[in-house]
């Protein structure tokens, strides 16, 4: 007799953690406060509640699907790991120079958002690949070893590697990875040829840096989550919602956590599209208000609008170009820092403002 499918859905937000159990046609749900220091504890508490409602034990769960804003919040709040960038000589400042676009064309005092890594965290090495993948300047292993030794001495936890045109020929990045694995076996490593193998170095470098920046945090969290769920008897496959609205394995998510940016909000947009399809509605505006943020997504023909580049932490009235570009498939939505728990304050001009600070789950 085939075992009945029992699925657990979990969404961790800035204020609440929502847990839903699906068994056949029956749904059981609960809401618990997010536990910031150990988010997995809120999941375990919520799982215990819905299992009690359904009168089953965690061992009967056959699949867990998890959405989270932890990756996004780590980037916005800049509380990731100490990360180094290794890039092609002459391209150290690509992420600081940005592109020629200006998000406020006539503002003579325009202040650009600072890059995720300061200049002294960005290292260069002699190498150059042509656009067709031919080696223009070969890379020297001894130079790599010396540079990795310097990075190790500086106490970096994570390393991002982004070379020019590595999406065509990744040989130089692979050699750096080989040396890092020998000299710094405990370091987290992100290669642009794996994280974002496409042209446009500004977006590619930013995406790779973001992945490296949050990788130690997310890999540690996902490892704790798996162990905690296993200890409670839930030893089923765990999947995570990615930014494009699909799911990826826990192992894949731990390796490429940048794909979890907008993981939680993407789930809300997908659900809204499902409701639109059920009722045959072609034009829908999805609105998802949480305790910390509110998200809006346009859904046309029962399909959420998607994009190939997403900006995290827009700093200038949410204008395009004022954030950090992440080059991943993503459900296109507008997110603002105003939710049910947003805090009111008086700014420097003595005007009343609401958000983006939130009371969260620990006001």
Predicted region positions:
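N-terminally biased helix-coil "hinge/interface" segments that flank
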Residues: 1-363
